A protein has these predicted regions:
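A C-terminal functional module that forms or caps the active site or interfaces directly
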Residues: 172-223
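Mid-sequence, gly/pro-rich, charge-dense loop/helix-turn segments that line enzyme active sites
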Residues: 84-190
Length: 254
């Protein structure tokens, strides 16, 4: 990591990275099967990479961005499933807290969560989550003021077209694709999470070790319930483009 290094731009799947159509690529390097694109986004130098799905891939790629490429910060751009029933497909969540919901100890038929790296045993810290720095949060809020992030068509709502809303909140990370309304309700109730994905908290664990700022931006492609396996492919491209608009603006202040 270098204070004057480029931004690291991460995505999990091709559609999430392709949504950044203003990305100018100058050269490429392949490491560990991942293609790192060196170039610019707007006025900022950056290294962009499609890291793959899940926590292990995300942690590996984040480490390479910070150690091999000297990135000063990481932006994660992508889609997620919604947990908060008040949110809709196309809404955007900027994570001000990232929680790994599937790490911990199985006790009495339930998972008791612990922070990754902490032994999941009695007597050890039970504090969980990675919080967005408050001063960076305010910079992001100011930068996003007045930004038109678009929306999704009537097919996403079953009625009228929906103008995307931008929300700061808790995002949950785990190695599952959630297609279960009951579990969605439990996770929302237990953790206060408003969106769920498969990489963010793993990247946060790495970023914390390096002392690097991280901002995770997720547009909702589905609502993590019984229809998510159909909604995800249907609204993936539109949601990825919405997230990319937000990330482009945040790149000016991180």
């Amino acid at each position: 990591m270098r204070a004057d290094g480029p931004i690291g731009l991460m995505a999990a799947i091709p559609q999430e990275l392709a949504a950044h159509d203003d990305l100018v690529v100058r050269t490429e390097r392949e490491i560990a099967g991942c293609r790192f694109r060196l170039g610019r986004l707007g006025t900022r130098d950056l290294v962009a990479v499609e890291g793959g799905i899940g926590k292990s891939h995300a942690a590996m790629v984040a480490t390479l961005l910070l150690q091999e490429f000297g990135c000063s910060s990481i932006l994660f751009s992508g889609v997620a499933g919604g947990l908060d029933p008040d949110l809709a497909i196309g809404d955007v969540v900027v994570a001000d807290r990232l929680v790994m919901h599937d790490y911990g100890a199985r006790v009495g038929g339930r998972l008791k969560p612990y922070q990754p790296g902490v032994p999941p045993l009695p007597g050890f810290s039970e504090e969980i989550g990675y919080d967005l720095d408050q001063s960076l949060r305010e910079k992001i809020r100011d930068a996003l003021e007045g930004l038109d992030i678009g929306g999704v068509g009537a097919a996403a709502t079953g009625g009228e077209p929906h103008r995307s809303r931008l929300i700061f909140g808790t995002v949950l990370t785990g190695d599952i694709f959630l297609n279960d309304a009951q579990e969605r309700e439990r996770l929302h109730r237990t953790f206060g999470g408003i969106a769920i994905e498969m990489e963010g908290a793993a990247v946060a664990a790495v970023a914390e070790c390096f002392g690097a700022p991280l901002v995770v931006v997720r547009a909702l492609s589905d609502l993590a319930g019984t229809e998510s396996h159909m909604d995800f492919p249907a609204f993936l491209d539109a949601a990825a483009r919405i997230a990319a608009r937000v990330v482009g603006r945040i790149s000016t202040v991180i």
